[in-house]
From Swiss-Prot:
Protein's UniProt name: Intraflagellar transport protein 20 homolog
The organism's taxonomic lineage, starting at the top: Eukaryota, Metazoa, Chordata, Craniata, Vertebrata
Cysteines engaged in disulfide bonds, as pairs: none
GO BP annotations listed: cell differentiation; cell projection organization; regulation of platelet-derived growth factor receptor-alpha signaling pathway; spermatogenesis
Function recorded in the entry: Involved in ciliary process assembly. May play a role in the trafficking of ciliary membrane proteins from the Golgi complex to the cilium. Regulates the platelet-derived growth factor receptor-alpha (PDGFRA) signaling pathway. Plays an important role in spermatogenesis, particularly spermiogenesis, when germ cells form flagella.
Keywords: Cell projection, Cilium biogenesis/degradation, Coiled coil, Cytoplasm, Cytoplasmic vesicle, Cytoskeleton, Differentiation, Golgi apparatus, Spermatogenesis
Source organism (scientific name): Xenopus tropicalis (Western clawed frog)
Localization, UniProt: Golgi apparatus, cis-Golgi network; Cytoplasm, Cytoskeleton, Microtubule organizing center, Centrosome, Centriole; Cell projection, Cilium; Golgi apparatus
Major localization listed first in the record, in broad terms: Golgi
Coiled-coil annotated residue ranges, if any: 87-114
């Protein structure tokens, strides 16, 4: 009966017969909730560490990807410039070939003219020798 009157006043005895303000069931549930919260906080901390590690890994991969992308762009630009250089060099060579063909044609015409002059001079010499 004394316990009931104390319970009505909000005072309770625990399993060690200590006087408590909270009901022993509520105190036990509070302790269980406290432990669950502690476990939850530990799990959240572990989760944050794992997520932090994943974020760092993704950041590193992003940096590596960006570096490789820049290398690929540089290589592509280099190939384009080499192709343009080769095309320019090819055009220069075509121009040189055309120039050499024109020079060859001039030399051929000059050779034919010189052959004609030589033939005329030989004919003149032969006629001159015959007249003597």
């Amino acid at each position: 009966m004394a316990r009931d009157s104390l319970s009505d006043a909000g005072l309770h005895f625990d399993e060690l017969n200590k006087l408590r303000i909270l009901d022993p069931d509520v105190a036990q549930q509070t302790n269980e909730l406290k432990e669950e919260c502690r476990d939850f906080v530990d799990k959240i901390g572990h989760f944050q560490k794992v997520v932090g590690g994943l974020i760092e890994l993704v950041d590193e991969l992003a940096k590596e990807t960006e570096n490789e992308k820049m290398k690929a762009i540089g290589a592509r630009n280099l190939l384009k410039s080499i192709a343009k250089q080769r095309e320019a060099q090819q055009q220069q060579l075509y121009a040189l070939i055309a120039e050499k063909k024109m020079q060859l044609e001039r030399y051929r015409i000059e050779y034919e003219a010189l052959c004609k002059v030589e033939a005329e001079q030989n004919e003149f010499i032969d006629q001159f020798n015959l007249q003597k």
